[in-house]
Curated annotation (Swiss-Prot):
Binding site for ATP: 115, 157, 162-167, 197-200, 205
The protein's name: Formate-dependent phosphoribosylglycinamide formyltransferase
Organism, scientific name: Polaromonas sp. (strain JS666 / ATCC BAA-500)
The reaction(s) this protein catalyses: N(1)-(5-phospho-beta-D-ribosyl)glycinamide + formate + ATP = N(2)-formyl-N(1)-(5-phospho-beta-D-ribosyl)glycinamide + ADP + phosphate + H(+)
Molecular function GO labels: ATP binding; magnesium ion binding; phosphoribosylglycinamide formyltransferase 2 activity; phosphoribosylglycinamide formyltransferase activity
Subunit comment: Homodimer.
Pathway linked to the protein: Purine metabolism; IMP biosynthesis via de novo pathway; N(2)-formyl-N(1)-(5-phospho-D-ribosyl)glycinamide from N(1)-(5-phospho-D-ribosyl)glycinamide (formate route): step 1/1
EC number of the protein: 6.3.1.21
Every ATP-grasp domain range: 120-315
Biological processes annotated in GO: 'de novo' IMP biosynthetic process
Cross-referenced Pfam families: ATP-grasp (PF02222), PurT_C (PF21244), RS_preATP-grasp-like (PF22660)
Signal sequence interval, chain numbering: none
Positions bound to N(1)-(5-phospho-beta-D-ribosyl)glycinamide: 22-23, 82, 293, 362, 369-370
Length: 402
């Protein structure tokens, strides 16, 4: 796009997000700063992104009829999936009919909506290094795959879930049924199918944020952010930092893998490519065709954060992935199961040097629900990590009184 309209006018440039959580909220803000009219869609009312968008819509996004009806009614220029649980076959149908452009493409949305599509693409089509894996449809198949192929320890995940839900490590035979039951409970759209992966004894894991954006000649160029290190607990990110130190050979392999998979997915936008690293060896893990939770650290480390990069790239604008400072992020959990909670300690948190926080505005809290994030920058990334965790620890969510 080279011309942008005025929001809420007949010539507005309209973008619809499918999924409006904390990541979508920041994308919406970035789009609005560029004069875009925004439509925030989610499965529940008052989702974080709906609180800041021009228009809020609530539907079951995995229902093809509801999704088609909404897109045909709103007629956005772009549809931007921000979650996996979407009727992607309908997106492909609408894209093929010329009704809408899907970011990055409808095919990419379909392939990345579950772990099977993207793993088969990476390992079987592109030949990228991955952990050994088997897909299973029953507890019996899971046990057989472990016994004959994968071995112990191993990792079990639902084919579709988010934020690590349903993911667990199996140390031995006694853990298999528990892991299966947990995966069935944690799948976002349960089809009774899991992936079991051989355990890689990696040194660390990173997210390689990769941006496909138009260059001055109108051709797609690939840009890389500095690698983001992160720690996950049960598959859910709890802290991240940027940059993560890497050997040059490992860095180049990481970027080659990221480019291979994002080139195949195509389109424009930011992708979060997760990788395991041991020495100079690198294995592909997963990819999301959208901003990544570990990439929230870029709100304090880059001149253009991951949300601004995504917004610019999908609109056909130039991008800048340069780092401005080392930094870190740490998750603020809900700590309680309640609606409309309040947060104490915000001022104390912000007294930690060089810190900031984001409270997402989710209408309902759970003990382990991500309700905010603390950010910290420092020339020394380890100082930034310590400060981010300290700031996060000072924010105290609680049930509102009265």
């Amino acid at each position: 796009m080279t011309t942008f309209g005025t929001p809420l006018s007949p010539h507005a440039t309209k973008v619809m997000l499918l999924g409006s959580g904390e990541l979508g909220k920041e994308v919406l803000i970035a789009l609005q700063r560029l004069g875009v009219e925004t439509i925030a869609t989610d499965r529940y009312d008052n989702a974080p992104g709906q609180q800041v968008a021009h228009h809020a819509r609530t539907i079951t996004m995995s229902d093809p009829a509801q999704l088609k009806s909404l897109i045909e009614k709103e007629r956005p220029h772009l549809v931007v999936p921000e979650i996996e649980a979407i009727a992607t076959a309908m997106l492909e149908e609408l894209e093929a009919a010329g009704t809408v452009r899907v970011i990055p493409t409808a095919r990419a949305a379909r392939l990345t909506m579950d772990r099977e599509g993207i793993r088969r693409l990476a390992a079987e089509t592109l030949g990228l290094p991955t952990s050994p894996y088997v897909f299973c449809d029953s507890l019996q198949e899971l046990q057989a795959a472990i016994d004959t192929n994968i071995g112990y320890p191993c990792i079990v995940k639902p084919v579709m879930s988010s934020s690590g839900k349903g993911q667990s490590k199996i140390a031995g035979p006694a853990d298999v049924k528990t892991a299966w039951d947990y995966a069935m409970a944690g799948g976002r759209v349960s089809h009774g199918r899991v992936i079991v992966e051989g355990f890689i004894d990696f040194d660390y894991e990173i997210t390689q944020l990769t941006v496909r954006a138009l260059g001055a000649d109108g051709q797609v160029e690939t840009h890389f952010c500095e690698p983001i290190g992160h720690i996950q607990v049960s598959g859910d990110y709890v802290e991240s930092w940027q940059p993560h130190p890497m050997r040059e050979a490992a860095l180049q392999k990481s970027r080659a893998i990221a480019k291979a998979v994002t080139d195949d997915l195509g389109g424009q936008g930011l992708f979060g490519v997760e990788l395991f690293v041991k020495g100079d060896e690198v294995w592909f893990s997963e990819v999301s065709p959208r901003p990544h939770d570990t990439g929230m650290v870029t709100m304090c480390t880059q001149w253009q954060n991951e949300f601004e990069l995504h917004a610019r790239a999908i609109l056909g604008l130039p991008v800048n992935t340069a780092l401005k400072s080392s930094g870190a992020s740490a998750v603020i959990y809900g700590g309680v199961d309640a609606k409309g909670i309040v947060f104490d300690g915000v001022a104390d948190a912000l007294r930690v040097p060089n810190t900031d926080i984001r409270l997402f505005g989710k209408p309902e809290s759970f003990v382990k629900r991500r309700m905010g994030v603390a950010l910290a920058f420092d020339a020394d990334v380890e100082v930034a990590r310590a400060n981010a965790k300290l700031a996060a620890s000072r924010v105290k969510p609680r049930v509102a009184k009265g």
